[in-house]
């Protein structure tokens, strides 16, 4: 009996560490995909979302925070720094007005950014640590969970009001309109769980099971988004990487919620 409990605990710790790895490496992929995206825009004489001098500082801060988080050095502080860096860069890109996106694409982009910020706040609370030396900050974790709830509300909203998202689900998931409504209800229920703070572990477990097929069939269908909906290739790859980071957050909360 004791060996079964020990093996189960070991497995949960291993899965939790996997979630931490996916989340802490997310900024590396974000910086790489942004560099590739802005290189493509430079060839077409188009501007990046953030002016170039500030862009280098922004990416430097992201890589610095991601490096320390990955090595587990002052992870809580650098997770908080990563959340702040991402919030500032997103705000700067939004008010800069250098690139204009469609409303449906803004919802996809900014909702994922909000979820990643929430993931960093969850990490800054002390969740996902194998050997916790300090007590967990429940306020930071609750705030991160609220951000995840906001992301899920945006996904549910897109399923009802964005024809681009609806077609992505209709074309690549069986069940047609009924499946869309089931996903809408499921996203809404999960959002309520994260926003209220009740049944968070169960909601995170469901989300961790739900996200991989959605990432594979919806976000991973680059041909649909790039060729049909004219989303820039590396922008879609960045969104896909953020979905992986959100999955990592769900895994952390599912195993250490």
Swiss-Prot record:
Keywords: Membrane, Transmembrane, Transmembrane helix
Keyword Membrane: yes
Keyword NADP: no
BP terms from Gene Ontology: positive regulation of canonical NF-kappaB signal transduction
InterPro entries: TMEM101
Membrane-traversing stretches: 21-40, 52-72, 77-97, 110-130, 139-159, 182-202, 206-226, 233-253
Annotated localization: Membrane
One GO CC term on file: membrane
Topological type in the membrane: Multi-pass membrane protein
PANTHER family listed in its UniProt record: TRANSMEMBRANE PROTEIN 101
Function: May activate NF-kappa-B signaling pathways.
Protein name: Transmembrane protein 101
């Amino acid at each position: 009996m004791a060996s079964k409990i020990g093996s189960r605990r070991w497995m949960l710790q291993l899965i939790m560490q996997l979630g931490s790895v996916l989340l802490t490496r997310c900024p590396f992929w974000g910086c790489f995909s942004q560099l590739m995206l802005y290189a493509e825009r430079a060839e077409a004489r188009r501007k990046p979302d953030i002016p170039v001098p500030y862009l280098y500082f922004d990416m430097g801060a992201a890589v610095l925070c991601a490096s320390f988080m990955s090595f587990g050095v002052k992870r809580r502080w650098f997770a908080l720094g990563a959340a702040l860096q991402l919030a500032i860069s997103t705000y700067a890109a939004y008010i800069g007005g250098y690139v204009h996106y469609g409303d449906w694409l803004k919802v996809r982009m900014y909702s994922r950014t909000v979820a990643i910020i929430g993931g960093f706040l969850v990490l800054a609370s002390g969740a996902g640590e194998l050997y916790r030396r300090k007590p967990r900050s429940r306020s930071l974790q609750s705030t991160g969970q609220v951000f995840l709830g906001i992301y899920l509300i945006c996904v549910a909203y897109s399923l009802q009001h964005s024809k681009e998202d609806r077609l992505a689900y209709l074309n690549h998931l069986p069940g047609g309109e009924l499946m869309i409504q089931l996903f809408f209800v499921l996203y809404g229920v999960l959002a309520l769980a994260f926003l209220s703070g009740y049944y968070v572990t169960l909601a995170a477990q469901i989300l961790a099971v739900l996200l991989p097929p959605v990432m594979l069939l919806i976000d991973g269908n680059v041909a649909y988004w790039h060729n049909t909906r004219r989303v820039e290739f590396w922008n879609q790859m960045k969104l896909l990487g953020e979905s992986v980071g959100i999955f990592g957050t769900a895994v952390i909360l599912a195993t250490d919620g």
